[in-house]
């Protein structure tokens, strides 16, 4: 989410399962950038969120391993999640209906389905390859700016670049200049305050590339950063 680090989730799952610990993976940051095979990962749960998959806000999905489904009790009551009910007992429907009480977000669910179908049509391998090309190009261009400090420089990373600028310029000020030049970045601690403390910074700007971005837009980012450096450097 901040550094673009690709985590060895399979190794974490294997280590946790050796101790009898179930694993929930927040795949919101990964699923949009690369193919995901939950069977290969070996996780018990894998959650995704719609608005980070080109879908509508308020939507999402979760994979639950069938063995875990059998162990879990519903957390919410409502229509369609019960098979029979009396004053003495309740019999739940089979999963997944057991966990889907009441009326779902119908429009959001349809929108998320269309977004996922679109991504499948483009192809996750193709998306990953395109973003890898962008990442390598951006890494080359950004490391050429000796007054820009990149946070997280592993060779094998997603197309996400967090940075600070030499001098006293705050990330919010830098992002304002970039915005004036038509470049959208995120500025702040990115819900990762402890990481900011570890890096020794109060905030960073984060440029994230997706399947719709181009190398020309990387150049636009660099041009806007050079302008910001002229103003704040």
Show the residue positions of the predicted features.
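Pyridoxal 5′-phosphate
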Residues: 1-233
């Amino acid at each position: 989410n901040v550094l673009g680090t690709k985590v060895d989730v399979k190794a974490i799952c294997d280590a946790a399962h050796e101790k009898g610990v179930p694993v929930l993976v927040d795949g919101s940051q990964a699923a949009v950038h690369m193919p995901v095979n939950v069977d290969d990962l070996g996780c018990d749960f894998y959650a995704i969120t719609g608005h980070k998959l080109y879908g509508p806000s308020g939507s999402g999905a979760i994979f639950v391993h069938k063995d875990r489904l059998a162990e879990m009790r519903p957390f919410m009551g409502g229509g369609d999640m019960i098979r029979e009910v009396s004053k003495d007992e309740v019999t739940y429907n089979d999963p997944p209906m057991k966990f889907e009480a009441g009326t779902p977000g119908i429009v959001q669910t349809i929108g998320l389905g269309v977004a996922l179908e679109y991504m499948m049509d483009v192809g996750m391998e193709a998306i990953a390859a395109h973003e890898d090309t962008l990442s390598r190009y951006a890494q080359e261009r950004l490391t050429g700016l000796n007054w820009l400090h990149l946070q997280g420089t592993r060779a094998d990373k997603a197309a996400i670049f967090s940075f600070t600028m030499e001098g006293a310029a705050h990330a919010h000020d830098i992002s304002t200049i970039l915005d004036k030049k038509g470049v959208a970045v995120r500025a702040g601690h990115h819900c990762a305050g402890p990481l900011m403390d570890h890096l020794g910074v109060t905030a960073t700007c984060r440029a994230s590339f997706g399947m719709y971005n181009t190398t020309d837009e990387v150049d636009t980012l660099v041009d806007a950063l050079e302008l910001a450096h002229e103003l704040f450097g």
